[in-house]
Amino acid sequence: MNTQDVANDLVTLCKQGKFAEAGEKYWADDVVSVEAGAPGGGDPVSRGKDAARGKGEWWEANHEVHGVEVEGPYVNGDQFVVRFKMDMTPKQSGQRVTMDETGLYTLKNGKIAEERFFYGG
């Protein structure tokens, strides 16, 4: 699969709410996942598929998602960008918010070698 194919499929899965399935399908074993902030007070950088999976499990356990909009993908070479807008409630605060996030994905051998997330205000 080329970058466009991977990007299109990842977006399709995310639009269906299948974020964990998208990760399992496309993360490289040594994927590096970088958040703008440290999730749950942990490290903002997760290294390896198990760590990325754990970060996702923590996120799902600590947030209630009411709806998701997914835009993209926007492809350039071995990279692509996807924008996510999530209507969600962090369980700790109980305050419903809209999170605006952009993911930059870099592929190597058809797998996500790095994902880097940026947040809007």
Predicted regions mapped to residue ranges:
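Hydrophobic side-chain positions on well-ordered alpha-helices
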Residues: 13-14, 73
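A solvent-exposed, acidic/Ser-Thr-rich amphipathic alpha-helical stretch
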Residues: 5, 20, 24-77
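Solvent-exposed, amphipathic alpha-helical segments
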Residues: 6-13
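A beta-strand edge to alpha-helix "cap/lid" segment located at domain peripheries
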Residues: 2, 53, 57-121
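Alpha-helix initiation/capping motif
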Residues: 12, 41-45, 94
